[in-house]
């Protein structure tokens, strides 16, 4: 990625101290087209500020725009919704930070972006080609950190965690049916997936298991999600004072970078 960025940056006016390596580290999974798009977005940000030279100040927000879509600062949010979002994102961040097998939290924001009310950005320290079961388990708990925080601090759940629940359910299903990581069902896969080219590469699944096994798969998925939620709730309950500090900082500043977030945890 570093080399691709250098190629696309060669015809752009970058400040001398721009850290291309840092940008490469923050863009795992980006294709060549994504990286080109990122530099184009940074050039647009720079032009809007009537600046001639692209700096890290324009490059870092461009990463988030490519991943999550544009900021929607014009969207009017009530104080109550803002507060719920702050607890929700603080829940993700705290659970993610305290579990050993998750990617480091780089940024937390309660500024709406794309379709999200806020976001917590975690990035791997290095490129990964394999994923372990312990990583999936901890990631599940982090995904449910927002749901857990809403339940603990408000005694209610909003529609905010719906995409988290979809991701968690999909991850749990993959643990059981694709990666053979279920203790109960053992080292095998379930459901033959075939690409249906004429449907635009939509995946068709051929069910190669019984109704009884289907129920066991559902039970295992539910058990994984419930255990992850239990883990998230335990962490948040034990760290309530820290949560309050993170929430207060988010409500004041709207965005916390990695260093500012970690300073609050001391």
Question: Which positions does each model-derived feature cover?
Answer:
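Short pre-active-site segment immediately N-terminal to the catalytic Zn-binding motif
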Residues: 74-84
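Short, conserved phosphate-binding/catalytic loop or strand-edge motifs used
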Residues: 60-63, 114-116
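Generic detector of short, locally flexible boundary/turn motifs and exposed helical patches
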Residues: 1-2, 25, 52, 57-61, ...
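Soluble catalytic regions of large protease machineries
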Residues: 82-87, 93-266
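Short hydrophobic/aromatic residue motifs in ordered secondary structure
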Residues: 34, 91-92
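Conserved C-terminal "switch" segment of AAA+ ATPases
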Residues: 2-60, 69-70, 74, 143-151, ...
